[in-house]
């Protein structure tokens, strides 16, 4: 019996090869997208799962309650680690950890790499693969462990035990001996360092080399291991006794509560109700990056299943006699249903093979979209993935084949064999499915066009400071700043050179400021001479800082419009007195336009600019014209090598800080563009199949109409009338869905974006109609001009 089912299936494939090919290709594309979505989910869900002790590791985090908002912080006071070691008997291990970018020198080559400092028990707590050497090297202050990729890149070998590597701190070299080489961590790991040394080494680069571990002002990431989960509540309660020592040393930063966050959930909990400040680990994926691809894949799979169902019902008219005879010969309905579901399973299996082949191309393309993702296709090594494919096959075959199987086998053999029953083409169900197909296609097209327009909008949006033609580099001290500035002044393409301690786009700090009875957290940027001119920050009231003015350094500030608004200053803000750190009196001497320190992500925050002298400069800001940007950057890089040969050039474009927003826009355009094209093609092919089969059902009617004098235009209207109605309904449904869903997506990502407007909707709906007209145009026109004699003779 099974053999007969297979033979019948392949006979029907040959008879309807064009329509079957359309279905298999469409479903294959949908299956490939489902594979990518599953791998994306699996990659995220396995974040940090390779660490053996992950379930027993906790990070000490804290809450800060301020003005009704509970802020989260990932760091804990460094002395708390020693306190826990000495007094908390329920804690099995304690590890302090901190990480930052560092400069290194191997031979004559200077390079930058992420560097970590940790207590000696770090590798006892976390699972790393050792390639050579020993993890015990972390107990030795003179040794360093490096990643295998770093060893291969700069030593051209992994056999580097005993080799020397120099860390550069403020131009001073600190020598290390390589004591171990570890395999670089996967991208779904919290740790992203390429080198790690014993915790005590970090104090060698500070001015005060003795009090670092005992000063409650100093913060770091703090891990503890608790093997018995029942002890966690008691440990959390014990920790609250050490809130006071920290708060006594930080009047500007008072914590409310310590809490423990399980290591396995760190990545998932990064995106909570409030921003997790002070994160030193690799961020996890936002929920939208996990759920989004899955929803898109489901949309495409539904489109493919709709196509399959529509086509199956449409071509079923050719198989009525087969069904009638089989029922007359004793065939029961259950056998026929099983046969149709078997045919669906075989076609879906073919689509699964096509999807697996397409996934070989889609997975690398998806990896290229996101720098923090590396999906891999491993069928034999990943049992859960293999199970997913089987479940996907069964589910797809069931969804696509269940309705046609029950519908086609429901008719009585007498009606079929007497020729009283004829169906095919479209019915209410196929019309509904086609409507949803085009609605989903329109949704994807609207999203793609909206993100394209938004990319241009955000590219030109005024952030309150210059984004183009600005290069910012780090300097160690005033001597280095002066030497570098003097050398750069020789370049005629450089317009302005300014000094600063902070920078509006990526380096500032938050502290409470009080005006009369109102207190708010504000973003404070310490700037130097000519900073406003270099960054093109608009002064809308008052004056700029006076050069070398000790009074301005001590008590003058510039504030943003958002600052004035949030503090409720309704009259002239100039001269108003502010209170900072509970005792420092500051006076507003100028108001600048809003500065979007967080780019498009958040609403303009209240910003306060303070004036600092050259002794505090850590940044040099260079302004040039956009067309000279590359040439000036090259000049700065070469000049830096002469000024500070032991330090890596750190220059970066200010516009580069908008990279994340640009990447999201670009990738959203690519993803929704791909989905829109695929969805439109699926809908178009489904429409083509239904129109073709509908024409076959109406050949006699069309022939009679032409004999009776109907024009070609009238015939085209008869053929396409119901499909135009379907498109109109789909346009309304898809337009509404596209408008609201796209706006919700953008609103969840950005504060400043270009909403979907009527022009976008009009363009997309027009594009959908053009696709539909092109799809059915040739077929309907050819039918309208055919000789009626031929169709009537055949009928």
Residue ranges and their predicted role:
Residues 2-6, 11, 15-16, 51, ...:
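Membrane-helix entry/capping segments
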Residues 44, 55-112, 121, 152-157, ...:
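Hydrophobic, regular-secondary-structure patches
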Residues 29-58, 363-371, 440-468, 745-750:
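Alpha-helical transmembrane segments
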């Amino acid at each position: 019996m099974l053999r007969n089912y297979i033979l019948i299936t392949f006979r029907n494939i040959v008879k309807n090869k064009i329509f079957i090919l359309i279905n298999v290709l469409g479903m294959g594309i949908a299956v490939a997208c489902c594979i990518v979505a599953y791998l994306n989910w699996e990659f995220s869900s396995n974040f940090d799962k390779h660490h053996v002790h992950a379930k027993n590791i906790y990070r000490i985090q804290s809450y800060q309650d301020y003005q009704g908002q509970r802020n989260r912080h990932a760091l804990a006071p460094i002395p708390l680690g020693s306190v826990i070691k000495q007094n908390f008997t329920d804690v099995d291990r304690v590890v302090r950890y901190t990480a930052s970018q560092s400069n290194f020198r191997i031979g004559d080559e200077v390079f930058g790499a992420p560097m970590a400092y940790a207590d000696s028990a770090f590798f006892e707590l976390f699972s790393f693969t050792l390639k050579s050497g020993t993890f015990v090297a972390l107990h030795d202050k003179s040794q360093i462990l490096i990643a295998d990729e770093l060893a291969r890149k700069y030593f051209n070998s992994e056999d580097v035990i005993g080799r020397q590597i120099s860390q550069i701190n403020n131009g001073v070299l600190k020598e290390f001996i390589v004591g171990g080489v570890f395999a670089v961590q996967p991208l779904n790991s919290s740790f992203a360092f390429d080198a790690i040394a014993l915790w005590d080494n970090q104090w060698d680069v500070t001015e005060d080399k003795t009090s670092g571990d005992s000063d409650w002002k100093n913060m770091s990431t703090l891990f503890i291991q608790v093997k018995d989960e029942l002890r966690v509540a008691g440990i959390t309660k014990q920790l609250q006794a050490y809130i006071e020592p920290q708060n006594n040393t930080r009047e500007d930063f008072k914590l409310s509560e310590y809490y423990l966050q399980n290591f396995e959930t760190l990545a998932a909990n990064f995106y909570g109700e409030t921003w997790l400040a002070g994160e030193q680990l690799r961020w996890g994926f936002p929920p939208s990056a996990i759920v989004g691809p899955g929803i898109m894949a489901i949309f495409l799979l539904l489109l493919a299943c709709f196509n399959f169902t529509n086509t199956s019902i449409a071509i079923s008219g050719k198989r009525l006699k087969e069904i009638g005879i089989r029922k007359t010969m004793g065939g029961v309905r259950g056998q026929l249903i099983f046969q149709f579901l078997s045919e669906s399973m075989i076609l879906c299996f073919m689509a699964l093979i096509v999807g697996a082949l397409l996934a070989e191309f889609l997975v690398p393309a998806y990896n290229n979209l996101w720098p923090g993702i590396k999906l891999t296709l491993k069928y034999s090594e990943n049992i859960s993935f293999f199970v997913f494919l089987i479940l996907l096959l069964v589910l797809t075959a069931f969804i696509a084949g269940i309705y046609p199987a029950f519908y086609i086998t429901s008719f009585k053999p007498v009606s079929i064999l007497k020729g009283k029953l004829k169906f095919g083409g479209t019915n209410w169900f196929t019309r509904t499915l086609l409507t949803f197909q085009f609605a989903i296609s329109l949704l994807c097209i609207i999203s793609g066009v909206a993100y394209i327009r938004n990319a241009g909008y955000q590219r030109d949006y005024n952030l309150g400071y210059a984004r183009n033609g600005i290069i910012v580099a780090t300097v160690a001290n005033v001597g280095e700043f002066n030497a570098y500035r003097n050398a750069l002044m020789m370049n005629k393409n450089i317009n302005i050179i300014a000094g600063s301690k902070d920078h509006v786009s990526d380096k500032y700090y938050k502290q409470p400021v009080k005006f009369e009875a109102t207190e708010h957290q504000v973003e404070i940027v310490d700037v130097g001479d000519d900073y406003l001119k270099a960054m093109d920050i608009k002064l809308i009231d008052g004056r700029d800082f006076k050069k070398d003015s000790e009074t301005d350094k001590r008590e003058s500030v510039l504030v943003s419009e958002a600052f004035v608004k949030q503090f409720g200053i309704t009259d002239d803000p100039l001269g108003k007195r502010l209170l900072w750190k509970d005792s420092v009196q500051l006076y507003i001497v100028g108001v600048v336009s809003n500065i979007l320190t967080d780019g498009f992500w958040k609403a303009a925050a209240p910003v306060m600019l303070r004036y600092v002298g050259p002794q505090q400069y850590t940044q040099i800001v260079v302004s040039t014209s956009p067309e000279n940007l590359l040439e000036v950057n090259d000049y700065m890089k070469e000049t830096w090598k002469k000024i500070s040969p032991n330090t890596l050039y750190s220059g970066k474009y200010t516009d580069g800080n908008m990279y994340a927003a640009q990447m999201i826009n670009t990738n959203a355009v690519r993803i929704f563009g791909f989905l829109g094209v695929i969805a439109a093609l699926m809908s178009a092919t489904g429409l083509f199949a239904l129109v073709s089969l509908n024409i076959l059902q109406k050949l006699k009617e069309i022939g009679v109409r032409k004999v009776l004098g109907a024009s070609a235009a009238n015939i085209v209207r008869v053929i396409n009338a119901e499909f135009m109605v379907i498109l109109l309904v789909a346009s309304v449904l898809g337009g509404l869905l596209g408008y609201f869903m796209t706006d919700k997506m953008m609103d969840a990502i950005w504060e400043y974006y270009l909403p979907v407007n009527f022009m976008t909707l009009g363009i997309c709906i027009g594009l959908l109609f053009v696709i539909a007209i092109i799809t059915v145009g040739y077929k309907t026109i050819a039918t309208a001009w055919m000789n009626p004699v031929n169709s009537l003779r055949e009928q």
